[in-house]
Structure formats: structure tokens, C-alpha cells
A protein has these predicted regions:
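Basic- and hydrophobic-enriched, low-structure N-terminal and domain-boundary segments
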Residues: 1-180, 187-195, 199-207, 441-444, ...
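Phosphate-binding and hydrolysis-coupling loops of NTP-dependent motor/remodeling domains
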Residues: 2-4, 43, 95-107, 532-574
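Conserved nucleotide-binding/hydrolysis micro-motifs of P-loop NTPases
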Residues: 62-64, 101-104, 172, 219-223, ...
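Conserved ATP-driven motor cores of ASCE-family P-loop NTPases powering translocation/secretion/packaging/pilus
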Residues: 86, 470-561
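Glycine-rich phosphate-binding loop of nucleotide-binding enzymes
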Residues: 148-250, 500, 521, 547, ...
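Short loop/turn elements that form and flank the Walker-type P-loop nucleotide-binding site
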Residues: 171-172, 208-210, 396-398, 441-444, ...
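P-loop NTPase motor domains
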Residues: 205-208, 220-231, 246-473, 547-550
Length: 574
């Protein structure tokens, strides 16, 4: 006779606890009718005879039939295609549960002792889950610092759904979205941006309507918001930055809240040493070992303001050297530069071989950044990405969404080293500006999202790209940016290809399906994942992810099903 689930105070009885339970893990045997209704990821309660109520999550389900065990009496019959009689077989199901804690009036307490064999197991109610969500689920009114990105795995149906939430109060601690191509990682980041774009205010950031954001868009995954800013109405404007000469340059916006701007860099935001390091690094493909003399000499040359004023008198603005002008004059006034270097040669300040290498590095920089891609205007005042631009996009009263369009349409024919240079310069400018905000006591916030993060902070031990001029400043932002309100959101398909120091600074991870070679790295960088989660990392369906870290409202890793974005017409949901 079938055992039907009992209802106790509105709860459905699912089964009974088996022996050898621990304070962190246990097994229960479901009732016959409950065998088909339970799912992995399902929340349950254990009402112990000790007077305690445990909250737990089903992590694994196993079905048993004595006639289908290896070497059983029916083994020979099975070989002949004869099935044993189901009605006389000993059949049962066992469900493994992870014990999350003990439900108390004050919330969820740590379980300091295990439940007892025979304790009944019930389906968890919304009231049981309130300590985890920290608000009344029955009202649907969540705090404004939570954004809903999907559903808890196992609770996706309309009649039985639980929201998957992200806590924005910890966004300044950085986060990463990882997964192989086609796993849904760009859809997930897009969903987060969409949710930020519909906020009407954030309680803990009273002056902000939403969090300003800048996205390094590698494949055009976020251009929907430029085409239709109504998808992200909380942003006063959606700005698309593209390279001069790209296909996007001639595609004017159709919406009044969209703006198209060509990428123009202001070198004056950086020190002579930083400029010199960039020029030499690009020339040597990032391998500065052995180029120390060149770097030191170029740094000294660019720092000698008096000599530069004398030779490049048109490059002086308000008594200051305009390095945009100096670099632009390299080709036209090469003789002046050669005269400076010749003076140093005669004074034995530089070896001829070093001087020649520095000249070649300067010419290479000019040809790549100015002649070919036109991203350094003749004067710094004509730069589009400058301190005023940062002030504008992070204005709390009118936060903006900025898309650095590095797709084939926005960066047609642009070398990776040039994209790295742009990202490095933007990050350096942001770091400098946000440090100044903090010194002045001014609170500013910006989410900086980088798609294909492995190209900008590569792990040089394993990733063939070899180097990135953006890596050093990206590491600085990862380690210190949180203090100033500069938040990172990294997106990558190969997390082990990203610099380990940068990845270790991420305090929240949204993990989609990963490559087998990345499983160990992911488990390490996240601080360890439960074995039952780790086993599934390589074969999760698209849209399914593991959420873990400080932006997770749950104090442990959980499976979540991310909702699809409202619109995504430029590329696949990857």
C-alpha cells in the first residue's frame, strides 16, 4: 500500500532520516509518493525529536532496486532480456542532504549536533527560508539592494519559485562571471546590467539612482542598450565608444539618450614614467627584461620638462608640457628629438644602441597609436576620455552606461595591443580620479566590466597572449579599487588564463559550465566548493550557474538558473 505524504501544519512530510547523520550532512529515505517529487537543490526541514528544526538542501538522489544490483540472482535473466517482477523487488530511494543550520527565532544558527535517525523530513516553507533571504518572501517586496537575476535551481516553476538574488552592498568587493562559450556567461552579465538599469534607487547609496557602469564589450554583446536605452532607463545616457575608421563610426544613434564618441586618449593623465613604460612595453611585446636601460632613459627624457619646452615650444599649455603634442610631433619634428638624444650621446648619458632602440620604440608607438588607429589627438584637450568624462559618467544625479565597443564593428581591424593600451589607460585614469575623489571626501562609484578578461590580465604561465600593458594597473584596481568605489566585474571563458592575483581579488563568482582543465583552478580561487557541486561544473546546461561569495545572499554556494535577457540581438547568448 502506497504511503502518501502527510501534511503537518501546512507542511508536506517527505520521509525519514536514516542512521549516521552528521551535523553537516545526512541521508533520508523518502516516502513512496515523495520519490518522484523531490529534486536536487530542494530545501527541506528536519523536525528532530530533540526539539530542533534543521534547514537542509537535497544534494543527491539515488534509487535502488535489489534485482538490479551487480551480480544479483536476476543477472543471467537480464542478459537474456527478461526483466524481474517489479512488485516483489525491494525498492527504495535515498536522498543526501546538506544541513545548513538550525532554525531559531533569531535566524539560522550553526548546527552543533546532528539530528536523530527517524526524524521526519518536510518540504521547507517560505517562512522557513526567511532567515536565508532576510525578508518576507510571501510579500515579494525585497530590499532595494537586492537584484533578482533568476531562480533557485529546483524552484523555477511559477507555482514553486524562489528568486536568485545578488546583494549589491558587496559589489565593491569585485566579482567574476566565468564559463565556456555557449554556457550563458555574457547573458548573465547582461542580466545584471539590465537589472541595474531598472533600479529606482539604492538604499545604502542614497545619492545614486543606480550604479554607473563601463563595459569593455569584446563581441557586441551589450550594444542592445545603445540601440534601445529604454531597456536601461535608470541610466541617463548610453555612450558607445568606438575607434576612428571603424564600421560603427558612421552608424549614428537612433535614440536621444544614446551617444556615439570616438576613442581619444589623454596622455597627460599619466606620469612620464608611465608613458615611457607603455611605449617600451608595446615595442618589446611586454618583455621588459633586458630593456631596463631603454625604459630608464626614455623616462628621464620625458621627465626633463625644460628641454622638452625648448625643443617643442608649441607643446606647452599653461606652463605644462602636453605629452599628446610631444608624441604627435615625433614624426614631423624627428630632427628635434634626434638633437636631444645626440646631446645625451655626446654627454655619455646614453649608449648609442639604447638611444637607437628608444627612437624605434617611439616611432613604433607613433605609427600604431597615432598614424594607424588615431587614438591620441594632437592636444590633450581634444581627448574624449579624460577627467571631465569620468566626472560626467559617475555623476550620482545622472549615472551613465558606457560601452567600450571592441567588437569587429566598433574596433574594425584594431590590434589587441591597442585595445590593451586603451583599457590600461582608462583604468589608470579611473584609479587616479577615484583616489582623488576619496581624498576630497567625495563618494563616487563605478562598475567596470571586462569581457575576455584573460586578454587584459593574462596568466603568462599558461596563456599564449603573453602580455598586456593593462595587466599592472588592472592588478592595482583589483587590490585597491574597492577602497575607492571602483568595482570590477570580470567575464572570461578560461579563468585559469587570468592572472591568479587578479582572480584571487574577486570575492563573488558566478560559475557556468567550465572546461575540465579549469575545475581545480575554479575550486581553488573560490576558496573551495562542495564536492557535489564540483562534480557538475563541466556538464551544466546553458544558463545554469553556481553562485558563491559575498554578493550571494546565501552563506554557501548555490545552483541558480539565470533568466534570459530582455533583448540580445547582436550575438549569441554566451
Amino acid at each position: 500500500m502506497a504511503s502518501e505524504p502527510k501534511l503537518t501544519s501546512g507542511r508536506k512530510e517527505l520521509g525519514y532520516l536514516l542512521s549516521r547523520a552528521r551535523s553537516s550532512f545526512a541521508y533520508f529515505q523518502p516516502l513512496k509518493d515523495a520519490e518522484v517529487s523531490i529534486k536536487e537543490g530542494m530545501f527541506v526541514t528536519i523536525n528532530s525529536k530533540q526539539g530542533l528544526t534543521y534547514l537542509a538542501e537535497i544534494t543527491e538522489i539515488s534509487h535502488y532496486n535489489e534485482y538490479y544490483e551487480r551480480g544479483e540472482i536476476w543477472a543471467e535473466a537480464l542478459r537474456e532480456g527478461l526483466l524481474p517482477p517489479e512488485e516483489v523487488a525491494r525498492r527504495f530511494t535515498v536522498a543526501a542532504v546538506r544541513i545548513l543550520g538550525i532554525l531559531t527565532q533569531g535566524g539560522l544558527a550553526n548546527a552543533d549536533k546532528p539530528p536523530l535517525p527517524g526524524d521526519p523530513v518536510y518540504d521547507a516553507t517560505l517562512d522557513d527560508l526567511r532567515p536565508l533571504y532576510r525578508y518576507d518572501l510571501s510579500t515579494g517586496q525585497k530590499p532595494d539592494y537586492y537584484i533578482e537575476v533568476g531562480r533557485m535551481y529546483g524552484y523555477e516553476s511559477e507555482d514553486r519559485k524562489l528568486p536568485a538574488l545578488i546583494d549589491l552592498r558587496n559589489i565593491n568587493m569585485h566579482f567574476a562571471v566565468i564559463g565556456t562559450t555557449g554556457s550563458g556567461k555574457s547573458n548573465t552579465m547582461g542580466k545584471i546590467i539590465e537589472k541595474l538599469g531598472t533600479l529606482g534607487g539604492i538604499g545604502f547609496l542614497k545619492e545614486y539612482k543606480t550604479i554607473p557602469a563601463m563595459i569593455v564589450d569584446a563581441n557586441g554583446d551589450y550594444l542592445d542598450y545603445y540601440e534601445n536605452p529604454d531597456l536601461v532607463k535608470s541610466y541617463s545616457e548610453v555612450i558607445r565608444l568606438c575607434f576612428e575608421g571603424s564600421e560603427a563610426e558612421n552608424k549614428k544613434p537612433y535614440h536621444q539618450n544614446s551617444k556615439l564618441i570616438k576613442i581619444k586618449i589623454d596622455l597627460n593623465a599619466f606620469s612620464p614614467t608611465e608613458i615611457a613604460e607603455t611605449i617600451i612595453a608595446i615595442y618589446h611585446s611586454g618583455k621588459l627584461e633586458g630593456a631596463e636601460l631603454q625604459l630608464n632613459y626614455l623616462s628621464t627624457l620625458l621627465s626633463d620638462v625644460d628641454r622638452l619646452r625648448e625643443k617643442f615650444h608649441l607643446c606647452t599649455r599653461n606652463g605644462e608640457i602636453d605629452y599628446n603634442c610631444v608624441v604627435n610631433e615625433i614624426k614631423e619634428n624627428l630632427k628635434k628629438l634626434e638633437e636631444l638624444i645626440e646631446e645625451d650621446r655626446k654627454a655619455n648619458k646614453v649608449h648609442s644602441a639604447t638611444a637607437d632602440a628608444v627612437l624605434r620604440a617611439l616611432m613604433n608607438f607613433y605609427d600604431l597609436m597615432i598614424k594607424k588607429h588615431k587614438i591620441i589627438p594632437r592636444y590633450g584637450a581634444k581627448a574624449t576620455i579624460n577627467e571631465d568624462f569620468i566626472d560626467e559618467i559617475t555623476n550620482p544625479k545622472s549615472p551613465k552606461l558606457v560601452i567600450l565597443d571592441f567588437s569587429t564593428e566598433g574596433a574594425t581591424g584594431v590590434d589587441l595591443s591597442v585595445k590593451q593600451f586603451v583599457v590600461g589607460n582608462v583604468l589608470a585614469l579611473l584609479f587616479k580620479k577615484f583616489t582623488a575623489y576619496r581624498v576630497k571626501g567625495e563618494n563616487r562609484l563605478l562598475l567596470f566590466v571586462i569581457e575576455e578578461a584573460q586578454n587584459y590580465a593574462p596568466n603568462i604561465q599558461v596563456y599564449p597572449v603573453g602580455f598586456s600593458v593593462a595587466k599592472k594597473i588592472l592588478a592595482s584596481v583589483a587590490t585597491q579599487g574597492r577602497k575607492f568605489g571602483l568595482c570590477l566585474g570580470l567575464v572570461t571563458q578560461r579563468p585559469s588564463y587570468v592572472d591568479p592575483i587578479v582572480m584571487s581579488m574577486m570575492n563573488t563568482f558566478i560559475i557556468h559550465r567550465v572546461a575540465p582543465g579549469d575545475v581545480r583552478f575554479v575550486s581553488t580561487v573560490t576558496g573551495g566548493l562542495p564536492r557535489y557541486i564540483e562534480r557538475r561544473l563541466t556538464y551544466m546546461e546553458p544558463g545554469l550557474a553556481v553562485l558563491t561569495g559575498q554578493m550571494n545572499v546565501f552563506p554557501y554556494p548555490v545552483f541558480v538558473k539565470i533568466d534570459r535577457r530582455v533583448s540580445h540581438k547582436y550575438s549569441s547568448l554566451t
